[in-house]
Amino acid sequence: MIVGVVLAKNAQKAVEKIKSGEADLYEVRLDHFSSFDGLEELEPFAPNLIFTFRSYEEGGRREASDEERLRVYKRVLELYPAYVDVGLNSGIAERVVKEAREKRVGVVLSYHNFEETPDFWELLGVVKAMEALEPDVMKIVTMARSLGDNLRIARLYEGRENVVAFCMGSLGRLSRLISALLAPFTYASLDEEAAPGQLTVEELRRAIEVVGDGR
């Protein structure tokens, strides 16, 4: 499945992008919102939505306190989305996981490294830390500094079915295709890149079709 990343300034604009999109799921980046009025407009689409409110340190668009982010997470959980995504190193990770479990909403626990792709054992340590919180999906995203980084992060798929792992940057595009084939879902842009090297939904579908035809 392909997740289209929704970058919008409010719920109404997010709805417009979802309606015109061709993805299977949509990640709504709440850190891009300038206002949280009208969040209920997203409720009809909730079964196909992943809500995330990234902190500034995790690549979020703006600074927001943990308490503000937690309040917004609680509001979107009332819409019963498919998932909420919260950063492993966020100060509210455990609380968001707990709130989501009470609502029976899926949890994506994420880790982003915008500088490099750490060595494999450090990546494995991230996975182990995530597993302690028992998320439904573990998302590990790093920055590719070499083509070899694609293969290193792909090793995280060995023996795991709930991992989404890939590299950002132009050197990491191979890992995005690997992710599309091995992960429960992977991410693509609707109209503008949410991360360096991100493919569009159309580009990713085309690439998957080519690889599929070659089997």
From Swiss-Prot:
Q: Where is the active site?
A: H112, K139
UniProt record similarity statement? Belongs to the type-I 3-dehydroquinase family.
What the entry lists under Gene3D superfamilies is as follows: Aldolase class I
One Gene Ontology term from the biological process aspect of the record: amino acid biosynthetic process
Catalyzed reactions per annotation: 3-dehydroquinate = 3-dehydroshikimate + H2O
Q: Which HAMAP family match?
A: AroD
Record's CDD domains? DHQase_I
Q: NCBIfam families of this UniProt entry? A: aroD, PRK02412.2-2
Give the protein name, as stated in the record.
Answer: 3-dehydroquinate dehydratase
Quaternary assembly: Homodimer.
Pathway(s) per entry: Metabolic intermediate biosynthesis; chorismate biosynthesis; chorismate from D-erythrose 4-phosphate and phosphoenolpyruvate: step 3/7
The scientific name of the source species is: Thermococcus onnurineus (strain NA1)
Report whether Ion transport shows up as a keyword of the record. no
